[in-house]
């Protein structure tokens, strides 16, 4: 609310992107803040139906449209049109956090760790789902994961492909970057 208030006072239109409504209440919190500021007519909350970089891709497009002078309504319509084209997925290095988040049992996390399983998590229709399980050393898994996405990557807007990671070895990131540049 504190972030919105100065813009509301200036009478500006505000567009907020939330993590997928099925994963978080952040969108609802933003809508409630707009109501409390009596600015529901000036604040548009867009359910990204995604997370992390998937939201970022939509925000980049919205910023481009805003710089072209588009209204919040025009931007919202354009974002809703590209939302189904946004792909976000990742491979987890450990099942510990999936277990802690209630997404897998303790037995599955233990067995998966012993077998060196690394599930590919995809965001589909605003929800996370495991689409494939890789097995082995993380560096090999990530390269296999990248190769499995080749068709989607070839059809992507080249300057909108992100390598998003959390503490991944620099060598792995560079290997993925090199692979992508050769596509």
Question: Model-predicted segments: where are they?
Answer:
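Glycine-rich oxoanion-binding loops at beta->alpha junctions
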Residues: 1-7
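Glycine-rich phosphate-binding loop signature in dinucleotide/nucleotide-binding domains
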Residues: 7-13
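Mixed-charge interfacial surface used for oligomerization/domain docking
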Residues: 15, 22-44, 50-183
């Amino acid at each position: 609310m504190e972030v919105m208030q100065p813009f509301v006072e200036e009478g500006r239109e505000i567009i907020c992107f939330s993590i997928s409504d099925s994963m978080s209440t952040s969108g609802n919190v933003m809508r409630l803040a707009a109501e409390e500021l009596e600015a529901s007519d000036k604040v548009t909350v867009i359910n990204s139906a995604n997370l992390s970089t998937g939201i970022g891709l939509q925000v980049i497009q919205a910023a481009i449209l805003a710089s072209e002078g588009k209204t919040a309504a025009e931007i919202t319509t354009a974002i809703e049109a590209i939302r189904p084209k946004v792909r976000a997925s990742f491979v987890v290095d450990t099942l510990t956090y999936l277990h802690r988040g209630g997404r897998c049992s303790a037995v599955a996390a233990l067995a998966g760790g012993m077998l060196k399983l690394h599930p590919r998590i995809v965001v589909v229709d605003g929800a996370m789902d495991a689409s494939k399980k890789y097995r082995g050393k993380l560096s090999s898994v990530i390269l296999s994961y990248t190769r499995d996405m080749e068709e989607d990557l070839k059809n992507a807007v080249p300057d909108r492909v992100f390598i998003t990671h959390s503490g991944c070895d620099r060598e792995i990131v560079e290997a993925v970057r090199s692979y992508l540049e050769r596509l």
